[in-house]
UniProtKB/Swiss-Prot annotation:
Disruption phenotype: Impaired ability to form spores when associated with a ytrI deletion. In combination with a ybaN deletion, cells show a severe sporulation defect. The gene is ytrH. Involved in sporulation. May contribute to cortex formation or stability. It comes from the Bacteria. Induction: Transcriptionally regulated by sigma-E. It is a multi-pass membrane protein. It comes from Bacillus subtilis (strain 168). The chain crosses the membrane at residues 16-36, 51-71, 86-106. One of its GO terms (cellular component) is membrane. This is Sporulation membrane protein YtrH.
Length: 113
């Protein structure tokens, strides 16, 4: 995430980036499944389940920023950076979970099982 922007901006961006990656990836993947002759709603549900971790990684800006923040927090005693990074990860997890829930509501795939 951008270090110059305020923390709340990064917090909100993290949520919506994860939400967008999950919903967008699942819907575009469902379109691809439809064009390939496969059931699109089933494909959307499966993709949403598989994209949760990638939405999280995309939202926090890759793994190196997170590792660097944890390293700085542990080695330099700057616990504020660790706390901020944990909050960003929780925000991204919330966005990914919200996206998965929206996809689940749209597809209603869990009802057909």
């Amino acid at each position: 995430m951008d270090q110059e922007a305020g923390f709340m901006v990064n917090f909100i961006n993290s949520y919506f980036i994860a939400l967008g990656v999950l919903i967008g990836g699942a819907l575009i993947g469902g379109l691809g499944a439809y064009l390939a002759g496969e059931p699109p709603l089933t494909a959307i549900t499966k993709l949403a389940n598989r994209l949760k971790i990638w939405a999280l990684v995309a939202a926090i800006g890759g793994t190196f920023d997170a590792v660097y923040s944890f390293e700085r927090g542990i080695l330099e005693g700057n616990t504020r950076d660790i706390f901020k990074q944990l909050l960003l990860i929780i925000s991204a997890m919330g966005g990914a979970q919200s996206g998965w829930l929206i996809i689940s509501w749209l597809t209603q795939e869990h009802l057909s099982s």
